[in-house]
C-alpha cells in the first residue's frame, strides 16, 4: 500500500523561500539611496531595453531585481493602479506607501497561494511634492510580501552583503548628486565575486533619479554624456585603459 506524498506547511514555506532567494541572488544588484535633492537609483544593468528602474507616478519611482517578466508585470500593475487612483481622486492621493502596501499584499498572496512564488524584490521610493520639505521615503518589499521602511538606502540582488557594508562605511546624508553617484557606483563595484573591486562604466549602469526640485514628474533618467560627467574620473580612465589592453571581465 502506497501512502500519498506529504510535506509539512513549514517545509513548503522554507522551500518556497529558498527558491525565491536563489532567484533574486542570481540577478545583478540595484541600489536606491536618498541624497540632498531626492532619491538616486543605480542598477548594474548592461541591457538598454530591459530596465530595472522606472517611474510609477508623479513623485514615485520603482526598482526591482529578479525575474524580469515577474517584476515587469508588477510594475505595469502598479502604474495602472496609480493612474486609476489619481484619476478617481487626486494625483496627490497617490503615495509611495500606498503602492508599497499594494505590492506587499500582492506578493504575500502569490507566496502563500500560488504554486511558485515570485522571484523578485522591489523598492518603491517617493519624494516630496514640489515646494514642500519632506525626507524621501524608501520601501523594500520582499518576495513573501514583507515590507520595510528604509531610512537611507536599499540594496537588492546579487551579493548584497559587501555592497551594504560599503554603503554603511561611505554613505553621507544630504550628499550632492555627484557624490551620491560616486558612493553608489563604488559600492556596486565592491559586490563582485572577486577580491578586487570592479570598475563599472556607463555601458553597464542604469541610473535615474527622483528629483524633488522638478515641478510635477520627479523621475528622470541619466544617460550618455550626463552620466559620464557624474562618474568618477578614475573610473572613466580605467575603462579606456581596459578597452586598449586586456579584455574586460563579464558584466
Curated annotation (Swiss-Prot):
The gene is prcA. This is Proteasome subunit alpha. The 20S proteasome core is composed of 14 alpha and 14 beta subunits that assemble into four stacked heptameric rings, resulting in a barrel-shaped structure. The two inner rings, each composed of seven catalytic beta subunits, are sandwiched by two outer rings, each composed of seven alpha subunits. The catalytic chamber with the active sites is on the inside of the barrel. Has a gated structure, the ends of the cylinder being occluded by the N-termini of the alpha-subunits. Is capped by the proteasome-associated ATPase, ARC. GO terms for cellular component: cytoplasm; proteasome core complex, alpha-subunit complex. It comes from Mycolicibacterium gilvum (strain PYR-GCK) (Mycobacterium gilvum (strain PYR-GCK)). Pathway: Protein degradation; proteasomal Pup-dependent pathway. InterPro entries: Ntn_hydrolases_N, Proteasome_alpha, Proteasome_alpha-type, Proteasome_asu_bac, Proteasome_sua/b. Its main location: cytoplasm. Pfam families: Proteasome (PF00227). One of its GO terms (biological process) is proteasomal protein catabolic process. Belongs to the peptidase T1A family. The formation of the proteasomal ATPase ARC-20S proteasome complex, likely via the docking of the C-termini of ARC into the intersubunit pockets in the alpha-rings, may trigger opening of the gate for substrate entry. Interconversion between the open-gate and close-gate conformations leads to a dynamic regulation of the 20S proteasome proteolysis activity. Keywords: Cytoplasm, Proteasome. The keyword Cytoplasm applies. Residues 241-251 have a biased composition (Acidic residues). Component of the proteasome core, a large protease complex with broad specificity involved in protein degradation. It is found in: Cytoplasm. The lineage of its organism: Bacteria, Bacillati, Actinomycetota, Actinomycetes, Mycobacteriales.
